Each structure stands twice: as structure tokens, then as C-alpha cells.
Design a protein with these regions (language model features):
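Carbohydrate-binding surfaces of carbohydrate-active enzymes
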Residues: 1-243
Length: 243
């Protein structure tokens, strides 16, 4: 239940046809940020921008749209990106240089160059951070750095820990609750870790998905911005934290 809380959407480009997993997503989960993949249809027909966030009709909103490391793009998608940037979106990725699709032509390539010069600038540099309209075009920075500059903290931080590990997590939100699902994907137990969540002002509860028991988490720290909870996990163990 609830709406997924996701900070980053990654545009698949032509990668969906080639079954490519892009390098941008490889560290996002470990850094504490969730991401989605989107295709051209979602960009063209569902995305809008409100208060600097990229929004979908189902209530999901993103801080960033990340473009693939590809030289080609459809003119329709590029025109929509231009519209979203002027409306306030932050777009992360390299400058496209040519067209793809049924209408690939020299004239379309000229249109693409005109739009990319407007958005990315006329100089092709390894680091780009340009304000265009109400939005930004960024390239050459790590995604977590860009989010940090936007004052977007990781949704989940693993602070004190007894070993080097990572957790899979899903965060959903409804009108009353923030719901985190946490899973240890290792065959070793996690004896101790302090997890820091991007929520505050609520009492956390732990729900065991195996037996359905719910207990109030009495030991936690709410610093006014984040909630810090000591946790442990059985091998392949999981549970929900609801606040």
C-alpha cells in the first residue's frame, strides 16, 4: 500500500532493446537512494514538473532524470526534456549528438544540435552544471553528489555496523505512514547496525512479515530530521519498519 518513494529515474533509451544495465544505478542502492527505470513512453506521455520534481500521474515523483551514456536520442524525447528543464527539472547525462528512430535525418540532427546547444551549452566539456530556465543540466558529477547539492539526504543510511554489508529496501508512503521493507540478502546474520531513515516525528513499529507480530520500537533517536534505529537481521531475514 502507499506510493513508492523514489529519488531517481533512469531513462533506458535504447538499452531496453539491448537488455543493458546502466552503470549509473550500480551504487545507488548502497548509497541509500531508490531508483526506477523509465522508457520513452513514460517521458513523453506521463511526466510533468511541479516544484522542481518530476511527477507521474500515479503520485510518484523524482528529483532527477538520468540519461543513458548514448549519443543518440529521439527528437520527441529531447523536446520533452527541454520542456521539463524549463519547467524546473534536473536532468543528468551526456549531450546527445544525433537522432534515432524512424525520422532520423540530417535536418533532425540539426534540430538536436540546436536544442542541445541551448541545454548543454555550445562547449563540450567533461563537467557541466548549467541552469536553464527553472531547471538544470548536469553531467560529470556523481548522482549522490547532485542529490546532496539539492539537499536530498539518502533515504536509508547504514551507520554503525558490525560488518560490511548492504540491505535491500523499499520505501512507500501513504497519508498516515512511512513503510520501509528491509531485507538482508546474505546467508550471514547481521548482529548489529544502526539504520537512519529519512523520516521524523513518528514512533516506529517493527512488523515481522513471517508471523505478523507488530512491536513498538522503544529504542530509537529522532533528531528532528532523521530517525535512527538499532537493528539486527537473521540470515536472509527481513521485516517492515512502519512509522
Amino acid at each position: 500500500q502507499g506510493t513508492p518513494v523514489v529519488d531517481v529515474c533512469i531513462y533506458y533509451g535504447t538499452g531496453i532493446e539491448k537488455r543493458i544495465q546502466y552503470k549509473q544505478d550500480s551504487a545507488l542502492m548502497d548509497l541509500g537512494y531508490q531508483y526506477d527505470y523509465v522508457n520513452s513512453d513514460v517521458i513523453l506521455n506521463q511526466m510533468s514538473v511541479q516544484d522542481g520534481k518530476i511527477c507521474l500521474p500515479n503520485g510518484i515523483s523524482y528529483e532527477l532524470l538520468v540519461l543513458p551514456e548514448e549519443s543518440g536520442i529521439s527528437i520527441e524525447v529531447l523536446e520533452k526534456i527541454r520542456e521539463m528543464v524549463y519547467d524546473g527539472a534536473t536532468i543528468v547525462g551526456p549531450r546527445p549528438i544525433c537522432s534515432i528512430g524512424l525520422y532520423k535525418s540530417t535536418e533532425i540532427d540539426r534540430q538536436i544540435k540546436s536544442i542541445t546547444n541551448l541545454l548543454w551549452g555550445e562547449l563540450d566539456t567533461p563537467l557541466i552544471d548549467r541552469t536553464v530556465g527553472n531547471g538544470k543540466i548536469v553531467y560529470g558529477k556523481n548522482i549522490d553528489q547532485i542529490l546532496s547539492e539539492k539537499k536530498i539526504e539518502p533515504d536509508l543510511k547504514i551507520e554503525n555496523r558490525d560488518s560490511n554489508f548492504s540491505l535491500d529496501f523499499i520505501h512507500r508512503r501513504n497519508k498516515e505512514y512511512d513503510i520501509y521493507y528491509l531485507a538482508n540478502l546474505r546467508e550471514e546474520a547481521i548482529d548489529y547496525a544502526t539504520l537512519s531513515f529519512r523520516t521524523s516525528g513518528k514512533v516506529p513499529y517493527i512488523w515481522n512479515p513471517v508471523d505478523g507480530t507488530v512491536i513498538e520500537q522503544r529504542v530509537y533517536v529522532d533528531d528532528g530530521e532523521r530517525t535512527h534505529i538499532p537493528c539486527s537481521f537473521d540470515p536472509y531475514g527481513s521485516y517492515f519498519i512502519i512509522s
